[in-house]
Amino acid sequence: MALYEHIFLARQDISAQQVDALVEQYKGVIESFGGKVGRVENWGLKSLTYRIKKNRKAHYALMDIDAPAAAVHEVERQMRINEDVLRYMTIAVEAHEEGPSAMMQKRDRDDRPRRDGDRPDRGPREDRGPRPPREGGFGDREDRPRRPREDRA
């Protein structure tokens, strides 16, 4: 039997329990063909990059499958028929990853780069004094001459 990773996206307006029911339904199909489902991860409701069938969000689910190709074809056929499934993708893999997938791993806050917008080698702006005025440009709005209003007909 071959090893697969199977990911599917379900519509945003179904509940998490209905997503779990879909996973159990497809798990039953795979087991009826003599396959096994290892890890099952529900990634939850996430925003889509672009709209799919008028949906902006979707429930993501991942299944690690050890089954014959006929089982995978049957699961994909049933997903094509089901209106609650927006997209699916099955990938053949050499071995299943141990532990949680990359989507489920939490990054440590200390590992993330700083996002305060200032370079770490400089102090706060107050330590460096005020910025000099720009040359040739107008600083604040009060310094600019008023623009004449155009009458629109």
From Swiss-Prot:
Keyword Transmembrane helix belongs to the record: no
Segments of this protein annotated with the region Disordered: 94-153
UniProt-listed GO biological process terms: translation
GO cellular component: cytosolic small ribosomal subunit
Domain of life: Bacteria
Keyword Transferase set for record: no
Molecular function, one GO term: structural constituent of ribosome
Keywords: Ribonucleoprotein, Ribosomal protein, RNA-binding, rRNA-binding
Signal peptide start-end: none
Family statement drawn from the similarity comment of this UniProt entry: Belongs to the bacterial ribosomal protein bS6 family.
NCBIfam families, per the entry: S6
Function text: Binds together with bS18 to 16S ribosomal RNA.
Listed name of the protein: Small ribosomal subunit protein bS6
Gene coding for it: rpsF
